[in-house]
Amino acid sequence: MFKQWEGFQDGEWTNDVNVRDFIQKNYKEYTGDKSFLKGPTEKTKKVWDKAVSLILEELKKGILDVDTETISGINSFKPGYLDKDNEVIVGFQTDAPLKRITNPFGGIRMAEQSLKEYGFKISDEMHNIFTNYRKTHNQGVFDAYSEETRIARSAGVLTGLPDAYGRGRIIGDYRRVALYGIDFLIQEKKKDLSNLKGDMLDELIRLREEVSEQIRALDEIKKMALSYGVDISRPAVNAKEAAQFLYFGYLAGVKENNGAAMSLGRTSTFLDIYIERDLEQGLITEDEAQEVIDQFIIKLRLVRHLRTPEYNELFAGDPTWVTESIAGVGIDGRSLVTKNSFRYLHTLINLGSAPEPNMTVLWSENLPESFKKFCAEMSILTDSIQYENDDIMRPIYGDDYAIACCVSAMRVGKDMQFFGARCNLAKCLLLAINGGVDEKKGIKVVPDIEPITDEVLDYEKVKENYFKVLEYMAGLYVNTMNIIHFMHDKYAYEASQMALHDTKVGRLMAFGIAGFSVAADSLSAIRYAKVKPIRENGITVDFVKEGDFPKYGNDDDRVDSIAVEIVEKFSDELKKHPTYRNAKHTLSVLTITSNVMYGKKTGTTPDGRKVGEPLAPGANPMHGRDMEGALASLNSVAKVPYVCCEDGVSNTFSIVPDALGNDHDVRINNLVSIMGGYFGQGAHHLNVNVLNRETLIDAMNNPDKYPTLTIRVSGYAVNFNRLSKDHQKEVISRTFHEKL
């Protein structure tokens, strides 16, 4: 045993890398209230004031600065500080806060476009290296893409794919750095490498190469930390070191990679063990414990990546998805709520509301009531928290999983994900009606589909064609994803993050869908109303609708059952096709903010949505159609089965404060009851916004009045001022429930 482990109860974790066992043996469940919490220290105030000044300057400029000379890497940059005298946790991606990295490994053209957008130019040397000598992920992907994939991508059926940006959604077990130190982790990886024996064929050769890269990455992380004067070769000795060591593990990931989602994992309960030991030994006070957490969170709030304009259309508001998964319940029935669960959420008060880190509460009916009420209060005050159903994820992933990006569960350090963007199911329906021809470009996208020529659309005929399109697109989607992730592993491998995984990991292939509610409502309109297509040159470009129809979002099984059938069908079709590295097929109903861009690529649909108008986000009902109140809307979404959508079912829920009650305590209790009822039905995810539409309209027109206004959008939170006008208008047009 290491001397740094004195005071901890031993177990399997002392012999093998097993952070879960360490947590289960050592954490202390907290069932009390928030009364112990402390405000920010003077050091924290000074550091945060300087950070806010830089953030506001960045907001005006778009980005603050970029290093155009240095190629991204774990230890490529000199140390950077914000306020060296007052920083309790140190480390930035580059040599200065908010200075962004140029990462050419995903694609040199993308890096150059990103720089050009903000008035910067890549260095001649970097351009030369990645144009003439070093192939990139993007080049590899497009070398291998089939013509069918290129057509579907261009038409906006398969789009937003991680072929032009880092895939992300990989969570290193950064806790391992604090618990074991880098030297022990290197030693364990070397043992693994020596045991990787057998017939030297593709998979074994690749894995041996990857583990060798992981060992080098661990050494680079150690060197990077030493540049800040911190020795992470051995385990952390106290809470401050544990947070710092863990952060260096995460920092290596965001220095090396610019993945779409660079999530943190499940760290609050882990760090609480160190804080409790220090408090018991009189080494720190509660003020100092909160200071460590506040300053750790400040660092996470300042993570940035360089993005293309096209990327910003997909993922609006400059998100990084530093997702932290909080609470949940252990397999033994004890909740994983600790005082540190409160401290993390309390940063939303000490530092003000913010979109990052992406605070995610793993909700269970067995969480302490005091914690449920605290979470609800924080949601009402800050609109910064999302909730995910631990009771349906725990049986699949155990009690040491975390959320990647928005809604995607995986076991920390044991699973990784191949992120797959999404397929536009609303567009697929138009392809079914038009015989596989794109309604906007007039090009053939899906072969062997006859156009529907009836004067009034027949539900059974349309559904038959629609399912044929879904069958074809599922196969094409899997093939496309296989190419992308083969090339990402080859040309943009995440060595630092994968070094903090078990050597033999589970892999999840994360497919997604957009236009879910539009597709369901459109089929409902065809079935229950009379829908006549309007054609130009044989292509349906509009619809005339007679009569009404049931709309998804009103707890009406006539249409909700159609919605469920769609996801079940697409999930089943995906699973018929083999995946790269035998990854498990998963599916999400999640759009991020790409529902606006997808809408621009999608023609008029039978439900009455007009050409170019946004789709609804995630699994949400279409804007304004959930007329029966908040509970009916939630009930519809709760019917979408997690069993066929294990990558997540995203629901963004906005309610005006008065609908929850006229008194603060009443609002808290009502919100707890709403979430209890929703998750009790097996629903998966809920973004919670408690605010008035008028506030957002005023913020759009007077942004200076609301410099830190944070809202939940689709699986993440965003600073409202960072959204484009199109995205702001789309958010404002969503349903704000005025009654339960």
Curated annotation (Swiss-Prot):
Pfam families: Gly_radical, PFL-like. The active site is at residues 405-406. GO terms for molecular function: formate C-acetyltransferase activity. Keywords: Acyltransferase, Carbohydrate metabolism, Cytoplasm, Glucose metabolism, Organic radical, Transferase. It catalyses: formate + acetyl-CoA = pyruvate + CoA. Belongs to the glycyl radical enzyme (GRE) family. PFL subfamily. This is Formate acetyltransferase.
